[in-house]
């Protein structure tokens, strides 16, 4: 149904819609008064026929479409002023020739098409002021075009195949902009340019310009403001350019200029200078005189530190500075004085450091420094350091060192930057001066305000006192008057003749009125005494006294369920009736079921109550519309949740997505089995906000997975509780993108309406695009919203309501598309979700302690005391745990074995523990569990005072204790521990009673006392003991012997039999069984490979381990061969798969450190693992920081939280910065280690690295 508003539409922007095929709205032909129309990016294949009926159309845009021809319809538009059809598929034959004869045609844009020649009859468009033929394949320009179009102001012929221009171009004396870039123009000498005295823009990039074909008379063109001679291989800057006084923008990039020979006083008005991709080594000093310069591009040159003027800080208007791809090692200090600098690019240089003031630039948004390998950033000052606070934790290096008890020395760079007192810089002093001046000014103004208010208050108090005295005198002078006389005196003379008849109350009788639509309505006497409980009534009883005077009694009766307006109007009209009758009686209120005796006697004490109401209310009654169940497909775009409406059917479901089913009382979140859990969680949060804002918390939110959907879900979706028979299949196309949103603004004028679009950068709408005085329409194709501002006038609101109805009907939409009305301040959640960042969630600081939340008296004290969350990073600043010397290790081993009396070994076979043969003592398997029973002597306590009183025969007896060590291999299951606790441990407890201690240990996490009992002969093999003994030993095996921090921790562990597992810092054993027994009876060989950097004192133990443990009990006929690194034979490398690159740098052994970052204590804390760490110390619940001396790695566990990851990243940066400050430490790189894909630089720090264990669940 048409609203009749289309005939008043003056212009509309349909850009971004899909008008392919026959989808163009036919209602456009009703817009007979339309003067402008935009159809950009609308997938048009031909000019719509409806345009031929828009005879008043003046401006038409059809850019970015698929037009092949514009014949027919354009010729029917006699008033056409501008034709913009760029970026189509037009050819010369597809352009009608008669449109150029239109007298009013002024703008012609045919760029980015397939034109090979200038359209026919173009020379007849004599009124044209804009002609754009760029990005075509035009080879020549007819002479007649330049001869006739003498009124042109803008001419763009760039990106064609022009070799020359007609000489008649000199007739374009009014031309202001000429763009000829990317044309050969071999035969165009620019001799005609001086005749174009109005020319202000000249673009001739990549047009084969040389010093010969640039005329010196170019300096006569005083109006030139924008010149582009880039990509022309010019050796120097043309001399004529230096004389252009009004030049604002100059582009000379892509040439071969080696020197910029400018002098002082030239280019004083220049704002943009582009000298990129040249061969400059120096920027002239007079560049700093260009005080209006805002953008300077000098990338891809040969600039050094000496080539940048030291006074560059004088360019106070500079906002963009590009110095990428040069040879800069330093940059002048003056750059930090360019206070308006917003973008600074210094990438791909040789920078060592930057000026300290770089952190003080207030407007700097982009600082590109990548590909500067040796760059060391200066420390941040105090003001900038505050921005390092993350989750209320200050991660600045100085603050963390201070907490750790290591204050920076006065000579350090940090101390010099943050020192106060006399060493404050000029900026800090200026800030302090401004603060004092402002405080002083505020104090003076405050004193003046207080004085003025005091005077006003004094005068006011005096006046008030006089008025009170005057009123008291008047009251004393007044005599007591009757209240009836007061009523008569103050009675308002209001005419009630239109409400009450003249004969009302003129004689004895009773009148009853019912309140209907704010006014009393007289009732017939037959209905007297019948009252509806939802109505209100007015009753008048008039009697004649003996004196002949009339006496009136006025009542107003209120039903129990009467509406507010009826009760109010009955009271008001009762007073009006009394004034109408000039009565002196009171109006008496009567309520249902509480009537007075006087009122009941009027009806013979018989009153009938009737349920309901007989009259209508004067108020508008609102009827809540029935809820429309809708289905939305949820998607995540960054942090925003996008809800795309889909048809309400099972066929809309897709197992890869999450869906929100809004059924009114219940909101369902349905998740497909292939959907992402993050999308489901965000959809749930969206439903929570939808319920809170739109439903006031009255809806229930339910979630269900595809595999288990309750009948209630299917009932809400299909109307049937049974699960549909058909399968839910993937049907949404890959890479599906929802249709672009369009935001219209409704404009109204004298007799016309306009509907332009608001430009959405990158298709993103923001809340600040809406204005309180305006009316906007948001069109997302499947939904259309009308938003009305609070201050919008009534006519604009009405126009918006009618236009949104027409817009909904005109454009082809799905059947489930709906129109919604939104009011400013009361927007629905679905409307808000269409705008980026529109979320009114109350910000909550979850890092605040409960005490600080409960305390409210002094907010400043709370903020000052609790603004920093507790964090413990002290471990990062401690020195690395020193390695134990060989002598100390020997002494520790001796002490640990001193009290050992007995050691029995057991191994789990099947479900029982059996005694381990003595020849296998010290050999472990990764899939087995072992039990060691150790008996220790306990020395008796000596009596210090009564030592001499004991006789020699009375020596105290030696006591003992038993420690049971349970050792579990890395690949063993927990069943071994369960068997031990239920079988063997009870027997030990029964025997040893309270003298028993059980210690459970895991592979490579043994304590020193346990390791000391094996005296460095500790071998760990892969696999299971029984299986390996029977079937193993027939293939080569490689073992690595390694001691971390102490020789007590010496372990020999089997690794992959590959050459890249070798390391020059350790000894290795390579066991090679022969296929056939040699003549000398040897069945194999064991190579003991000595790394060049290995400890010579460990070589003897390597030989013992090889002969006692690596050689099997039945392989005594294996010969042992000692090999020094670099002296290997061919057999050695052949068994290892050929000679390959292995780790030869042993320095990492002295630097390896492993830190654990966790929140398990209730706050963020970092602790350091012992030097003897292993792969299983990498906890999937936490974040780890590993330092190998060359790089600092951040390793993220599979189950760690996002907060832990963010805090650990900041802490790792603090550690990285602290190591850089140490004089004896070499610089380290900051790298990320991805779990399961760790690099060899990371893995080499762990003894016998193997496959990562997958976390449970």
Swiss-Prot record:
Gelsolin-like repeats lie at residues 523-600, 640-714, 759-832, 1168-1243. Transmembrane segments: none annotated. This is Protein flightless-1 homolog. PANTHER family: PROTEIN FLIGHTLESS-1 HOMOLOG, VILLIN. May play a key role in embryonic cellularization by interacting with both the cytoskeleton and other cellular components. The keyword Protein biosynthesis does not apply. The gene is fli-1. One of its GO terms (biological process) is actin filament severing. GO terms for molecular function: actin filament binding; phosphatidylinositol-4,5-bisphosphate binding. Belongs to the villin/gelsolin family. One of its GO terms (cellular component) is nucleus. Keywords: Developmental protein, Leucine-rich repeat, Repeat. The keyword Kinase does not apply. LRR repeats lie at residues 6-31, 32-54, 56-77, 78-102, 103-126, 128-148, 149-172, 174-195, 197-221, 222-244, 246-267, 268-290, 292-315, 316-338, 339-361, 363-384. It comes from the Eukaryota. Pfam families: Gelsolin, LRR_4, LRR_8.
């Amino acid at each position: 149904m048409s609203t009749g508003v289309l005939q008043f539409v003056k212009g509309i922007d349909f850009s971004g819609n899909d008008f392919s095929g026959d989808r163009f709205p036919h209602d456009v032909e009703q817009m007979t008064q339309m003067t402008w129309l935009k159809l950009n990016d609308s997938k048009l294949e031909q000019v719509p026929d409806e345009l031929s009926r828009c005879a008043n159309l003046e401006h038409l845009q059809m850019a970015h479409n698929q037009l092949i021809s514009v014949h027919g319809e354009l010729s029917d538009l006699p008033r056409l002023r501008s034709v913009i059809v760029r970026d189509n598929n037009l050819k010369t034959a597809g352009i009608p020739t008669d449109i150029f004869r239109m007298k009013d045609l002024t703008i012609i844009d045919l760029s980015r098409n397939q034109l090979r020649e200038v359209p026919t009859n173009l020379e007849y468009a004599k009124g044209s002021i804009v002609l754009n033929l760029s990005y075509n394949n035009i080879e020549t320009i007819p002479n007649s075009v330049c001869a006739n179009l003498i009124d042109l102001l803008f001419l763009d012929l760039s990106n064609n195949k022009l070799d020359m221009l007609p000489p008649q171009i000199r007739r374009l004396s009014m031309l202001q902009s000429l763009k000829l870039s990317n044309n050969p123009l071999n035969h165009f000498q620019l001799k005609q340019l001086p005749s174009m005295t109005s020319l202000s823009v000249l673009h001739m990039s990549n047009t084969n310009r040389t010093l010969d074909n640039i005329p010196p008379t170019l300096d006569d063109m005083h109006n030139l403001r924008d010149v582009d001679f880039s990509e022309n291989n010019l050796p120097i800057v043309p001399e004529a350019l230096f004389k252009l006084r009004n030049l604002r923008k100059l582009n000379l990039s892509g040439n071969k200029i080696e020197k910029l020979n400018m002098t002082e006083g030239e280019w004083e008005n220049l704002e943009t200078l582009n000298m990129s991709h040249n061969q400059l080594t120096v920027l002239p000093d007079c560049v700093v005189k260009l005080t209006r310069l805002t953008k300077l591009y000098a990338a891809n040159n040969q600039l050094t530190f000496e080539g940048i003027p030291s006074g560059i800080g004088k360019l106070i208007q500079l906002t963009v500075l590009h110095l990428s791809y040069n040879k800069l090692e330093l940059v002048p200090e003056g750059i930090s004085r360019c206070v308006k600098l917003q973008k600074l690019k210094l990438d791909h240089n040789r920078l060592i450091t930057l000026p300290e003031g770089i952190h003080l630039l207030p407007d700097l948004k982009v600082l590109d420094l990548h590909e500067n390998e040796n760059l060391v950033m200066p420390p941040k000052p105090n003001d900038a350091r505050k921005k390092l606070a993350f989750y209320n934790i200050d991660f600045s290096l100085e603050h963390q060192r201070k907490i750790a008890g290591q204050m920076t020395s006065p000579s350090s760079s940090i101390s010099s930057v943050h020192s106060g007192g006399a060493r404050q810089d000029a900026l800090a002093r200026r800030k302090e001066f401004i603060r004092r001046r402002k405080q002083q000014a505020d104090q003076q103004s405050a004193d003046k305000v207080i004085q003025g208010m005091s005077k006003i208050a004094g005068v006011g108090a005096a006046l008030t006192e006089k008025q009170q005295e005057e009123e008291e005198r008047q009251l004393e002078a007044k005599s007591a008057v009757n209240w009836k006389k007061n009523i008569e005196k103050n009675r308002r003379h209001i005419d009630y003749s239109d409400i009450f008849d003249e004969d009302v109350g003129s004689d004895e009788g009773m009148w009853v009125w019912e309140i209907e639509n704010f006014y009393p309505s007289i009732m017939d006497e037959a209905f007297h005494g019948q009252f509806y409980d939802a109505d209100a009534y007015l009753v008048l009883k008039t009697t004649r006294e003996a004196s002949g005077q009339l006496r009136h009694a006025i009542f107003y009766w209120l039903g129990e369920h009467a509406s507010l307006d009826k009760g109010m109007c009955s009271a008001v009209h009762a007073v009006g009736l009394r004034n109408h009758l000039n009565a002196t009686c009171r109006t008496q209120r009567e309520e249902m079921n509480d009537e007075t005796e006087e009122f009941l006697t009027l009806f013979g004490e018989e009153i009938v109550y009737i349920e309901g109401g007989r009259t209508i209310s004067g108020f508008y009654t609102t009827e809540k519309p029935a809820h429309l169940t809708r289905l939305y497909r949820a998607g995540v775009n960054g942090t925003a949740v996008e809800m795309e409406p889909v048809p309400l059917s099972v066929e809309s479901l897709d197992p890869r997505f999450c869906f929100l089913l809004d059924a009114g009382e219940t909101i369902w979140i349905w998740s497909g089995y292939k959907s992402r859990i993050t999308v489901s969680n965000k959809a749930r949060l969206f439903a929570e906000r939808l319920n809170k804002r739109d439903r006031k918390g009255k809806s229930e939110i339910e979630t269900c997975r595809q595999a288990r959907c309750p009948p209630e879900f299917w009932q809400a979706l299909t109307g049937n509780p049974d699960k549909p028979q058909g399968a839910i299949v993937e049907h949404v196309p890959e890479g599906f993108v929802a249709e672009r949103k369009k935001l219209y603004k409704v404009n109204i004028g004298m007799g016309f309406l306009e509907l332009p679009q608001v430009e959405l950068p990158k298709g993103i709408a923001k809340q600040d695009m809406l204005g309180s005085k305006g009316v906007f329409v948001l069109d997302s194709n499947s939904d259309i919203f009308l938003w009305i501002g609070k201050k919008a006038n009534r006519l604009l609101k009405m126009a918006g309501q009618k236009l949104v109805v027409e817009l909904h009907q005109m454009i082809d939409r799905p059947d489930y598309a709906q129109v919604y009305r939104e009011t400013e301040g009361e927007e629905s959640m679905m409307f808000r979700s269409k705008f980026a960042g529109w979320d009114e969630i109350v910000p909550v600081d979850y890092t605040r302690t409960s005490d600080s939340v409960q305390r409210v008296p002094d907010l400043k004290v709370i903020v000052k005391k609790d603004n920093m969350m507790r964090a413990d990073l002290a471990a990062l600043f401690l020195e690395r745990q020193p390695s134990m010397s060989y002598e100390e290790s020997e002494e520790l081993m001796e002490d640990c074995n001193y009290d050992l009396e007995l050691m029995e070994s057991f191994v789990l076979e099947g479900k029982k523990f059996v005694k381990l043969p003595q020849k296998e003592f010290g050999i472990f398997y990764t899939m087995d569990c072992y039990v060691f029973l150790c008996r220790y002597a306990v020395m008796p306590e000596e009596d210090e005072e009564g030592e001499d009183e004991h006789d020699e025969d009375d020596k105290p007896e030696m006591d003992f204790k038993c420690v049971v060590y349970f050792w579990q291999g890395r690949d063993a299951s927990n069943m071994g521990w369960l068997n031990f606790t239920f079988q063997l441990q009870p027997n030990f407890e029964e025997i040893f009673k309270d003298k028993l201690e059980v210690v459970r240990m895991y592979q490579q996490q043994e304590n020193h006392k346990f390791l000391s009992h094996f005296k460095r002969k500790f071998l760990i093999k892969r696999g299971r003991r029984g299986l390996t003994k029977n079937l193993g030993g027939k293939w080569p095996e490689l073992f690595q012997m390694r001691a971390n921090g102490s020789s007590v921790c010496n372990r020999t562990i089997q690794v992959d039999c590959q050459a890249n597992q070798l390391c020059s810092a350790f000894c290795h054993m390579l066991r090679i069984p022969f296929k056939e027994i040699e003549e000398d009876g040897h069945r194999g060989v064991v190579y003991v490979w000595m790394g060049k950097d290995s400890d010579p004192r460990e070589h003897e133990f390597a030989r013992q381990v090889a002969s006692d443990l690596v050689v099997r009990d039945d392989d005594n006929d294996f010969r042992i061969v000692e090999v020094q690194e670099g002296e290997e034979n061919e057999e050695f490398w052949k068994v290892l798969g050929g000679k390959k690159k292995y780790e030869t740098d042993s320095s990492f052994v002295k630097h390896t450190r492993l830190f654990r970052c966790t929140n398990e204590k209730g706050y963020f804390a970092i602790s350091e693992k012992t030097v003897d760490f292993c792969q299983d110390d990498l906890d999937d619940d936490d974040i780890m920081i590993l330092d190998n001396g060359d790089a600092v790695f951040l390793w993220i566990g599979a189950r760690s939280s996002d907060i832990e990851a963010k805090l650990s990243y900041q802490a790792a940066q603090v550690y990285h910065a602290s190591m850089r400050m140490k004089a004896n430490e070499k610089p380290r790189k900051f790298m990320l280690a991805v779990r399961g894909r760790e690099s060899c630089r990371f893995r080499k720090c762990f003894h016998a690295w193997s496959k990562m264990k997958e976390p449970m669940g």
